[in-house]
Amino acid sequence: MLFNEFGNKNNPPVLLLHGMMQDWHSEYEMLKPLEAYYRLIIPAQDGFYDGSGDFTSFADQARQIEEYIHQHYDGKIHGAYGASQGGLMLTELLTRNKVDLGTVIMDGCYVAHQGKLSAKVTAWMFKKYKNTGKFPAFIHIMMTLMGTSLEEMADGLTAGMYMNASDETVDRNFLENYTYRTRPEIAHNQTMVHLWCGSKEPYAIKSHNILKKYLPNFDEEIMEGFGHGEFLMKHTADCCEKIYSTFG
């Protein structure tokens, strides 16, 4: 994992976790205004930065984050924000419960189990895009389920993709993501968790319903009319302001 830090070292430390297949630089550019208030910690997952080995597993990525927070911040930070797969990573960190994350925001979190077949098909579609610049025609079905469109993807999600990921990394990442299951141990974590998503995100809403069965402290906000990643990518200033008001 590659750990990047920005902002005044005297400011409260906040962890920012990027989404699936995303280049960490794109998340930093969107959330850069938060530098005025926090010390930003932005890890790049294995397999998604230049010179990296292949993606391993969410458990291994979580272990590396835990070790970093213990080494540099005595095991405690002010807050953590995760978009899309970043929310899944926060789910894993909360379940392991080895660091104090402060206040947590999951924005468009996907932990709804979709299975190995879906993982293989979706990985194939993204490898085709990565290697040829084109998606297969039935990508539109997946986009509808995500609450977005191919045009919106081109404006945001695909524009921020890390295009140098190996095929092995793509396969492993999708398999880990689509077969992830929320574990009951997360109920032992007393962290306050804010669940955000758009009303056009059926998988995220399904994920909320799973998480709400276990989380002892949470609130939920479903933003009317928004699709996957839309609040962060199209309303970036509002998103930064909302993160700041939530973390304090």
Predicted regions and their residues:
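Acidic catalytic loop of the alpha/beta-hydrolase fold
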Residues: 199-204, 229
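Catalytic histidine-centered segment of alpha/beta-hydrolase-like enzymes
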Residues: 226-236
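Active-site loop/oxyanion-hole signature of alpha/beta-hydrolase fold enzymes
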Residues: 41-79
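Conserved alpha/beta-hydrolase catalytic His-Asp/Glu region
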Residues: 115-117, 133-187
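Short beta-strand/loop motif that positions the catalytic acidic residue
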Residues: 189, 195-197
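Gly/Ala-rich beta-loop-alpha elbow adjacent to hydrolase catalytic centers
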Residues: 82-90
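Conserved HGGG/HGGXW glycine-rich cap/lid loop of the alpha/beta-hydrolase fold
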Residues: 4-50
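Flexible "cap/lid" loop of the alpha/beta hydrolase fold
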Residues: 95-96, 101-132
